[in-house]
């Protein structure tokens, strides 16, 4: 049930019937204050202005053409021309009952799309660090939400699995006569990487061999491909451990690395040159874009092939866009990477469109995110200034959560405690990030995330557990409740409206790639349930009020659990 969408469609038709120009935009929003109704239509004044009419008079014309029988119990014109909508109690009750019993809350997408979501994207032969956290968890929350809404989602883990570094790694593995590379731990591989780089910088013979291996690898040499595949497999096995711990849905089948697009690059560059988009400049092939200016005010040049014949990230991203459109048949692509990549993505996609590689209807979106900062406002680092490994961060989260839970509930069994600690530790790291607007820099603070106060994972997880405990005390299963929902208190009405707004929150996440919209919704829902619980006795009430309130509690628990699951955060039955 998407109340906002339903009201928007009906008011739009009424506006057009009243004489508004198409496309009429009713601008229906949730009301901030109860005296202004449950929803407001704010687009009447803009439509009236275009027609040269008095807004209040036009609002009355809209009401004359608006049929909300059975949906709204009252409509009123307010201020300079707002329309306030007060929803019918019977209508709310009917849809709350449907939402509780329906599969997927009765949520369906009218026009499901095929959507490619590019996220996480770590580099091969390097361990995942905190810099990969935001892309991984934000992307995964959006993926889960898009799938829940009925879309076909293709996960694309665009790993850095190609480049000159593989020549030196293969050469160094050979030098060490380490044919058992696939059994190595990634930490060893990182040490290999540093040692290989040192040899490459200081040993010309080694560097020459490494360069030869790059050429051989790129030309498909079998030995080099085998060694390269070992490096990729070791890395992805280790990354999978992080994904599993983070409760992220990526698997090895989602890997679509840079190497996937290599065969397309020569043809793309040749075509860009043939179309006159790419021109030679000092031996390199460059596309000049009028839409971007350099510091001198001239069109900015974007290199698509280097002087030595090598390709760049831009070339690969052009190929990726083309591949996702024509091979994966996507309607929409979302690439989750940090804000510093914005210009790069805009330029790559502008070239893609200028070359005619994708239709205008093909949506290319870059939902970027800000940096992860320490409490000092600087990029998040170890105490010695090094990069924080993702594994180490998660280990510390578990240690801290263990202390928090031990203090809060020492009576948990060892098995119960382990489950709660893992859920709280990983949930806290994820929720603390996901609850912030992704476009801003985010300050990582253990004290603010591992607490049962405020908009945190522990608070949300406890809110769910608290509701479940009501049913445990009552000895009742939620699906055994057959009485109708009845609303006898304003707190019940407010709670039902919030529950029915679940789909609106999910659509916000899907439309803009912003999980914080769902976090805010869940936090408000938990607060409204708490207010309802304080004001409206449940277990001490007489039937049918008792069962009605139990149904509201069941729907609140179901919604909280589903919402947290879409964020990739686990719930527990006991804390």
Curated annotation (Swiss-Prot):
Record PROSITE patterns: AA_TRNA_LIGASE_I
UniProt record similarity statement: Belongs to the class-I aminoacyl-tRNA synthetase family.
Substrates-to-products reaction catalysed: tRNA(Arg) + L-arginine + ATP = L-arginyl-tRNA(Arg) + AMP + diphosphate
Designated name of the protein: Arginine--tRNA ligase
Ranges spanned by the short sequence motif 'HIGH' region, renumbered to the chain: 122-132
Any Pfam family hit: tRNA-synt_1d
EC number(s) on file: 6.1.1.19
Provenance organism: Actinobacillus succinogenes (strain ATCC 55618 / DSM 22257 / CCUG 43843 / 130Z)
Places the protein is found: Cytoplasm
GO MF annotations, alphabetized: arginine-tRNA ligase activity; ATP binding
GO cellular component labels: cytoplasm
Xref: PANTHER family: ARGININE--TRNA LIGASE, CYTOPLASMIC, ARGINYL-TRNA SYNTHETASE
Keywords: Aminoacyl-tRNA synthetase, ATP-binding, Cytoplasm, Ligase, Nucleotide-binding, Protein biosynthesis
Chief place where the protein resides: cytoplasm
Record InterPro entries: aa-tRNA-synth_I_CS, Arg-tRNA-ligase, Arg-tRNA-synth_N, Arg-tRNA-synth_N_sf, ArgRS_core, DALR_anticod-bd, Rossmann-like_a/b/a_fold, tRNAsynth_Ia_anticodon-bd
């Amino acid at each position: 049930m998407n109340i906002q969408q339903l009201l928007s469609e009906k008011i739009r038709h009424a506006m057009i019937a009243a004489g508004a120009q198409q496309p009429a935009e009713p601008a229906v929003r949730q009301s901030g204050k109860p005296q202004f109704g449950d929803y407001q239509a704010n687009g009447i004044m803009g439509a009236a202005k275009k027609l040269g009419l008095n807004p209040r008079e036009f609002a009355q014309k809209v009401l004359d053409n608006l049929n909300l029988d059975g949906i709204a119990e009252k409509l009123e014109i307010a201020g300079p021309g707002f329309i306030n909508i007060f929803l019918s109690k019977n209508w709310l009750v009917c849809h709350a009952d449907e939402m509780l019993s329906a599969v997927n809350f009765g949520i369906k997408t009218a026009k499901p799309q095929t959507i490619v979501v590019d996220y996480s994207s770590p580099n091969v032969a390097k361990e995942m660090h905190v810099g990969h956290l935001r892309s991984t968890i934000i992307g995964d929350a959006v993926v889960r939400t898009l799938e829940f809404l009925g879309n076909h989602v293709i996960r694309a883990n665009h790993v850095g699995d190609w480049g000159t570094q593989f020549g030196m790694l293969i050469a160094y593995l050979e030098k060490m006569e380490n044919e058992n590379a696939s059994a190595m731990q990634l930490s060893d591989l990182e040490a290999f990487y540093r040692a290989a780089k040192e040899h490459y910088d200081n040993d010309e013979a080694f560097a020459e061999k490494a360069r030869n291996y790059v050429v051989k690898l790129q030309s498909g040499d079998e030995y080099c491909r085998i060694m390269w595949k070992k490096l990729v497999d070791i890395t992805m096995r280790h990354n999978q451990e992080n994904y599993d711990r983070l409760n992220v849905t990526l698997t090895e089948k989602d890997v679509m690395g840079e190497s996937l697009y290599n065969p397309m690059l020569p043809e793309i560059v040749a075509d860009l040159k043939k179309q006159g988009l790419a021109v030679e400049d000092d031996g390199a092939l460059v596309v000049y874009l009028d839409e971007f200016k350099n510091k001198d005010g001239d069109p900015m040049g974007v290199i698509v092939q280097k002087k030595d014949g090598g390709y760049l990230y831009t070339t690969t991203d052009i190929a990726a866009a083309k591949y996702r459109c024509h091979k994966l048949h996507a309607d929409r692509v979302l690439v989750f990477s940090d804000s510093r990549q914005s210009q790069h993505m805009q330029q790559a996609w502008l070239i893609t469109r200028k070359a005619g590689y994708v239709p205008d209807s093909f949506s290319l979106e870059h939902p970027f995110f800000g940096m992860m900062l320490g409490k000092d406002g600087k990029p998040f680092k170890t105490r010695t200034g090094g990069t924080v490994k993702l594994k180490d961060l998660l280990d510390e989260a578990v240690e801290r959560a263990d202390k928090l839970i031990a203090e809060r509930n020492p009576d948990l069994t060892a098995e119960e405690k382990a489950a709660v600690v893992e859920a709280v530790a990983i949930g806290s790291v994820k929720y603390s990030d996901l609850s912030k607007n992704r476009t801003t820099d985010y300050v990582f603070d253990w004290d603010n995330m591992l607490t049962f106060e405020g908009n945190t994972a522990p608070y949300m997880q406890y809110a769910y557990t608290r509701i479940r405990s009501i049913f445990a005390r009552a000895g009742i299963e939620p699906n055994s409740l057959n009485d109708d929902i009845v609303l006898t208190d304003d707190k019940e009405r407010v709670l039902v409206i919030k529950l029915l707004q679940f789909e609106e929150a999910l659509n916000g996440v899907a439309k803009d790639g912003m999980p914080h919209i769902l976090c805010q919704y869940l936090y408000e829902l938990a607060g409204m349930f708490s207010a309802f619980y304080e004001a409206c006795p449940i277990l001490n009430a007489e039937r049918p009020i008792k069962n009605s309130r139990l149904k509201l509690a069941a729907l609140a628990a179901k919604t909280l659990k589903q919402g947290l699951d879409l964020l990739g955060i686990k719930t527990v039955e006991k804390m």
